[in-house]
């Protein structure tokens, strides 16, 4: 199976999207049980990012859990997460910074780096702006040190964006972004041991391409993020 994390609902969504087969979820569930088809186990989120010790700028939670946008580039969420790879007994880390659009749930931009620093986040933002020069979204993040940096706030202002931040210790304030990390790690990362940086980076890049272009989502109307994005552009 391409994604062992798939449960019966996602299998049914793929049947509708890829083959035009329309049956109800209960029938797919019965078939899955008869064939002993099960999704992989779920893993719990390990917690929220702490607030920066000496924040230079803090924004209100203007998003306020309004996780809906009528148009692309209306609301963007962002965050950084870490991955591990192994060289014998040595453990190494890489970091993924990404921006997610709330209308179509596409990954607008991402950067992979060896350090969780300002440059990682700034590059991610610059890529998003370069690809969407006319975008002026509400820009939401947690209160990590990169996002409370005065220089980053100035970059947002220059791009005509309004900054929003989660409350301290409230992961759900950035729920869809945290949800994307969970999806990626359940489907491609947890339960695997990566023996090289190259292998891990290839997995991440391949998955984001798969997620944007091939992974259908029920709340998008059984469309992929890029299909939803194109649909919105045509309707504008």
Predicted stretch roles:
Residues 4-5, 20, 68, 86, ...:
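Conserved, non-catalytic sequence blocks in retroelement Pol enzymes and Pol-derived host proteins
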Residues 11, 28, 32, 63, ...:
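Mobile genetic element proteins and their domesticated derivatives, centered on retroelements
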Residues 1-71, 170, 224-233:
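Basic, flexible linker segments flanking DNA-binding modules
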Residues 92, 110-132:
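Active-site beta-loop-alpha junctions of metal-dependent nucleic acid enzymes
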Residues 157-161, 183-236:
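C-terminal domain-tail junction helix/linker
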Residues 65-108:
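An active-site-proximal beta-strand-loop segment
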Residues 52-54, 141-143, 149-152, 163-185, ...:
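RNase H-like two-metal-ion nuclease catalytic core shared by retroviral integrases
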Residues 104-110, 163-166, 190-191:
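Short small-residue beta-strand/loop micro-motif enriched in glycine and branched aliphatics
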């Amino acid at each position: 199976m391409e994604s062992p994390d798939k449960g019966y609902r996602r299998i049914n969504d793929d049947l509708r999207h890829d083959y035009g087969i329309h049956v109800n979820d209960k029938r797919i569930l019965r078939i899955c049980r008869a064939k002993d088809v099960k999704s992989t186990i779920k893993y719990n989120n390990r917690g929220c990012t702490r607030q920066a010790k000496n924040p230079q700028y803090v924004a209100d939670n203007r998003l306020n859990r309004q996780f809906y946008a009528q148009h692309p580039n209306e609301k963007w969420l962002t965050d950084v997460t870490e991955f591990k790879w192994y060289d014998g007994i040595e453990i190494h880390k890489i970091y993924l910074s990404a921006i997610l659009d709330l209308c179509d749930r596409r990954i607008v931009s991402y950067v992979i780096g060896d350090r969780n620093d300002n440059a990682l986040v700034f590059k991610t933002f610059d890529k998003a702006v370069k690809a969407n020069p006319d975008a002026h979204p509400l820009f939401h993040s947690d209160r990590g040190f990169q996002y409370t940096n005065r220089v980053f706030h100035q970059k947002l202002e220059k791009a005509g964006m309004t900054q929003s931040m989660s409350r301290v210790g409230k992961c759900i304030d950035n729920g869809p972004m945290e949800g994307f990390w969970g999806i990626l790690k359940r489907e491609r990362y947890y339960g695997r041991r990566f023996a090289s940086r190259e292998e891990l980076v290839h997995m991440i890049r391949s998955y984001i391409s798969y997620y944007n272009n091939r992974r259908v989502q029920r709340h998008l109307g059984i469309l992929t993020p890029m299909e939803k994005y194109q649909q919105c552009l045509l309707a504008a």
